[in-house]
A protein has these predicted regions:
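Short, surface-exposed charged micro-motifs
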Residues: 39, 50
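Acidic, two-metal ion nucleic-acid-processing modules in DNA metabolism proteins
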Residues: 20, 37, 78-81
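Short glycine-/aliphatic-rich beta-strand segments at the starts of folded cytosolic domains
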Residues: 1-18
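Short Gly/Ser/Thr- and Asp/Glu-enriched loop/turn motifs at secondary-structure junctions
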Residues: 42-47
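Short amphipathic alpha-helix segments
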Residues: 14-35
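Helix N-cap motif at beta-to-alpha junctions
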Residues: 52-58
Length: 88
């Protein structure tokens, strides 16, 4: 890994969610701010995501997710790539 590497994170957690639409809006805005690309699926059953960006951006989104106790300690798969794997 070098400083120009793209950090790829993936994780999921089954957790009953009463307000998935509100969460989608909030996390979409945060991902846009951080220039993260990929997919984040949020439903009444939980969360599933595959995101890619800078180390700082991926660290920030994980910290942001963990501000919600329901998303603490999501097991992550972390890989690195030389290019951005997602178009949006």
């Amino acid at each position: 890994m070098n400083e120009n590497s793209v950090v790829n994170i993936a994780g999921y957690k089954f957790e009953p969610l009463e307000n998935p639409v509100d969460l989608v809006r909030m996390y979409q805005q945060k991902c846009d701010e951080l220039k993260l690309k990929g997919t984040m699926l949020i439903s009444k059953n939980g969360i599933n995501f595959s995101l890619a960006g800078t180390q700082q951006a991926t660290d920030t989104i994980i910290a942001f997710l963990e501000e919600d106790d329901r998303f603490l300690n999501i097991p992550l798969k972390v890989t690195y790539s030389e290019t951005q794997p997602f178009r949006r």
